[in-house]
Structure formats: C-alpha cells, structure tokens
UniProtKB/Swiss-Prot annotation:
Protein name, per record: DNA polymerase IV
Keyword vocabulary terms for this entry: Cytoplasm, DNA damage, DNA repair, DNA replication, DNA-binding, DNA-directed DNA polymerase, Magnesium, Metal-binding, Mutator protein, Nucleotidyltransferase, Transferase
Cellular component GO terms, alphabetical: cytosol
Entry EC number(s): 2.7.7.7
Broad class of enzyme this protein falls into: transferase
One Pfam family recorded for the sequence: IMS_C
Family, similarity comment: Belongs to the DNA polymerase type-Y family.
Cofactor list: Mg(2+)
Function: Poorly processive, error-prone DNA polymerase involved in untargeted mutagenesis. Copies undamaged DNA at stalled replication forks, which arise in vivo from mismatched or misaligned primer ends. These misaligned primers can be extended by PolIV. Exhibits no 3'-5' exonuclease (proofreading) activity. May be involved in translesional synthesis, in conjunction with the beta clamp from PolIII.
GO biological process, one term: SOS response
Entries under SUPFAM superfamilies matching the protein: DNA/RNA polymerases, Lesion bypass DNA polymerase (Y-family), little finger domain
Active-site residues (renumbered): E105
Length: 364
C-alpha cells in the first residue's frame, strides 16, 4: 500500500505578520494584536515580542510587564479572513483535499496532486515560495505520511520552517518528542502524563492501550497510536461543524453567585442566538470557566433531548456551575458550548465528566 503524502501548512505569527506587512513602520518591532487595557488579552504576538516571552492568550498587562515597549494594534478579522482566502487559492492549485484548522493553518493531501509533482516536499517548497512572493508572508510546512506527524513537523523549525518526517524516521523522531509536543496534549493532560512518569514519546509507547484508556478515556487510544506513528484520520475537505460556543471575558473578576448567574444568563442567551442562526442541534453542553489566575476548567453533561433553546440550556448550565468552586477563586471568563450533533451523541447520556481532551476550538 502506498503511503499518503500529507502537508501541514502553518502561517507564522499570522495576524501579527499581516499587520507588519501592511504597516512597514511596525516591522522589526515587538507587536501584539489585541487591546492594551487592563482586561485585554493578546490575540497574537510577533516573533520580536515572543523573544520577551509574550504569547497569545496572555493578559495584556502581563505582556506589557514582560515587554514594556510592546506595541498593541487592534485586530482586523475581515482582513485576516481575506488573506486566508488568498492562501487557500494557492493551495487549490495543487490539491482540493484541504482541511482548514483555522485561518492560519491547514492540512493538504497531495498524494494525488494537480501538478503531477512526485515529491510532497517539492509541493511544500513551492507553496511556501508562492506565499512569500505573492503575499509577502512566511509559512512553515511539515511533510509526512499522516496528519499527526505532518503537524508535528511544521512546528519543528519555525519560523519559515520545512521539515519532512519519513516513515523510516518516525519511530525514532517520536521517541524523542516531549509529551507536551503531542497533538492534543495541553497543560492539564501534560501534568497528568508527568505524574504517570510519561515525559516523552518513548515512555508513552511503553504504555498499554488499556492503561491509557483507563487514565484518559477514549482519547487514550489516539495517544497509543500516535506513539507508534499511526494516524489513520483522512484529510477532510469538508469539515462538519461539531460545536458552537461563545464566551465572555468579564470587565472585572466576579465570585458572588448572583453576579455569576447573571453573566451565565447573558452567555447562554448569546449561545442560543448562534445556535439558531446556524441551525445547529446538539445535546452536550460544556461550561468553561477561566479564573483570575488564568487557570481554567470545563464541565460537560449530555442530555437525551437536543439543546436548542434557553429553557433547556440555562438550567443545565446552572447545574454544571454547581460543580465549580469559585467563591475563593474569582472568575475572569465564562463560556458555554453545545456539541455532539444528532447521530454523534455519546452513549453515556446524563453522566458527569471532566473534559480533558484539549482539541476543542469552541466553534471558532
């Protein structure tokens, strides 16, 4: 059986790079896309800012402490969407099997490609060059025989990187990979892995599938496969929306129940509007809480009936909130999302669970 040829393209510091491209006076300077006010959050950081430790999702106040000369510019989402479409026009000249993950990254299956190019790495080089010449932007590319390895490869030599992981190199490459670099392993899961003595791919490969499922649920099977260089997921040219959510960053931290309930009502109301606009139907509600110290938790519950209106969503959200201890830990952000559309409903209905799998993008 012939190996697949998968490319993962990741635009480097996309939002910040677009701003520096369009505003030459910002080039070479530490830049953050976002708002500088007290409750602001960094949406993206240029590489100049990253050298000071500034990262996306960091509070603007912390970012300014790390880099006092940091320049803040407001985001221009319509511009970023337009540039993303231009990038995808380049992709489509090589393949129509494109799976976007966000505005700035996508998988491409070039096993069969429109240009008849034999080597996937040559396609990746061509795409990178065209993005640079036509759009004045820089992208990193990872090339391998599955999605997991292609994504890992694209992160390996950023910015402006190009890395290929061949089948005969995969096991050794994965063995040395820090567990934090595995796709789907966020800070919470990484800490749990460390407590289990798992710090790299080699140690993960030594774990049985039964042990990983026992510790992490169904996603443990995915970790088991990843450690062996196995990822059978296809590049899905049409991605089915699997969740819709919304979240509010509060003007000030809150811990009084009445204030939390009022804010929960506002978030639930906005969520219902989005569900109705998109005609989305799901039966799992997830509550996301971010505390004043930026730690966060999620709580989820699945119902037999679809969650389509405020009368169903708000009582369930309040029930989820009872699982959160916030009186001593003021809340900074509240989010709600609905997932599990129609036939994808999990068999464990009505069962409380803590979500630890960190792929979710809250429908963004």
């Amino acid at each position: 059986m012939n190996e697949r040829k998968i490319i993962h393209i990741d635009m480097d510091a996309f939002y910040a790079s677009v701003e520096q491209r369009d505003h030459p006076e910002l080039r070479g300077k530490p830049l953050a896309v976002g708002h500088a006010e007290e409750r602001g959050v960094v949406a993206a950081a240029s590489y100049e800012a990253r050298r000071y430790g500034v990262r996306s999702a960091m509070s603007s106040q912390k970012a300014k402490r790390l880099c006092p000369q940091l320049i803040f510019v407001p985001g221009r989402m319509e511009v970023y969407k337009s540039v993303s479409r231009q990038v995808h026009e380049i992709f489509h000249e090589y393949t129509d099997l494109i799976e976007p993950l966000s505005l700035d990254e996508a998988f491409l299956d070039v096993t069969e490609n429109k240009q008849g190019i034999l080597l996937a790495v040559d396609i990746a080089k061509a795409i990178k060059q065209r993005i640079r010449e036509e759009l004045s932007l820089v992208a990193s590319a990872g090339v391998s025989y599955n999605k997991f390895l292609a994504k890992i490869a694209s992160d390996f030599r950023k910015p402006d990187g190009l890395c290929t992981i061949h089948p005969d190199q995969a096991i050794d490459f994965i063995a040395r990979l820090p567990i934090e670099s595995f796709w789907g392993v966020g800070p919470v899961t990484a800490r749990k892995m460390h407590l289990l003595g798992i710090h790299n791919g080699l140690q993960l490969r030594e774990c049985s599938s039964e042990m990983l499922v026992r510790q992490f649920g169904k996603v443990g099977l995915l970790y088991y496969d990843f450690a062996r260089g196995v990822d059978l997921r296809p590049v899905e040219a049409v991605r089915i929306r699997k969740s819709i959510g919304c979240e509010h960053t509060l003007e000030k931290d809150i811990h009084v129940r009445s204030s939390v309930i009022i804010e929960l009502y506002h978030v639930a109301t906005e969520l219902v509007e989005r569900l109705q606009q998109k005609e989305f139907r799901g039966n799992t509600l997830t509550l996301k809480i971010k505390f004043h110290d930026f730690s966060q938790i999620t709580r989820s519950m699945t119902q037999a009936q679809e969650l389509t209106n405020l009368e169903r969503i708000l009582p369930l959200a309040k029930q989820l909130l009872k699982e959160v201890e916030y009186e001593q830990h003021p809340i900074r952000l509240i989010g709600l999302s609905v997932s599990n559309p129609r036939e994808e409903a999990d068999e464990h209905r009505g069962v409380w669970e803590q979500l630890s799998f960190e792929f979710s993008d809250w429908g963004k």
